[in-house]
Each structure stands twice: as structure tokens, then as C-alpha cells.
Amino acid sequence: EAFPGQST
């Protein structure tokens, strides 16, 4: 799951 600030 992509969360704000995470570039995965």
C-alpha cells in the first residue's frame, strides 16, 4: 500500500 511520503 502506498502512503504519503512512502515511494513504494
Swiss-Prot record:
Signal peptide: none annotated. Keywords: Disulfide bond, Secreted, Toxin. Its main location: secreted. It is found in: Secreted. It comes from the Eukaryota. It comes from Phoneutria nigriventer (Brazilian armed spider). Has a vascular smooth muscle spasmogenic activity. Contains 2 disulfide bonds. This is U28-ctenitoxin-Pn1a. Expressed by the venom gland. GO terms for cellular component: extracellular region. The peptide is constituted by 125 AA. GO terms for molecular function: toxin activity.
